[in-house]
């Protein structure tokens, strides 16, 4: 279920501050964050944000299509490598 529009978007204050500083200084350095729950806002377009996936920070370039999504959607936490190949020897 989507968040109500009357509530507005959620973004952690420390991340919002880092985004404001990066926009003002036109910094190209990735912004490290552990806040996967924060929503992507229009101010973030063009920034690279390194989102923590539980093990490492995954760099993600924010584009216009990502607005309204959560940061965590773009840094997968699980790596599926497929099922093991069964031994094909006859029984």
Swiss-Prot record:
Signal peptide per UniProt: none
GO molecular function: rRNA binding; structural constituent of ribosome
InterPro entries: Ribosomal_uS19, Ribosomal_uS19_bac-type, Ribosomal_uS19_CS, Ribosomal_uS19_SF
One biological process term in Gene Ontology: ribosomal small subunit assembly
Keywords attached to this entry: Ribonucleoprotein, Ribosomal protein, RNA-binding, rRNA-binding
The keyword Ribosomal protein is assigned to this record: yes
A GO CC term attached to the entry: cytoplasm
Reported function: Protein S19 forms a complex with S13 that binds strongly to the 16S ribosomal RNA.
NCBIfam families listed in its UniProt record: rpsS_bact
Family that this chain belongs to: Belongs to the universal ribosomal protein uS19 family.
Protein name per UniProt: Small ribosomal subunit protein uS19
Organism: Dichelobacter nodosus (strain VCS1703A)
């Amino acid at each position: 279920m989507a968040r109500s529009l009357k509530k507005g978007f959620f973004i952690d204050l420390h991340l919002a501050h880092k985004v404001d500083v990066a926009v003002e200084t036109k910094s190209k350095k990735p912004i490290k964050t552990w806040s996967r729950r924060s929503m992507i806002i229009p101010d973030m377009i063009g920034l690279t944000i390194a989102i923590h996936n539980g093990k490492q920070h995954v760099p993600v370039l924010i584009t216009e299509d990502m607005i309204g999504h959560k940061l965590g959607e773009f840094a997968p936490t699980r790596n599926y490598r497929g099922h093991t190949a069964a031994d094909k020897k006859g029984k």
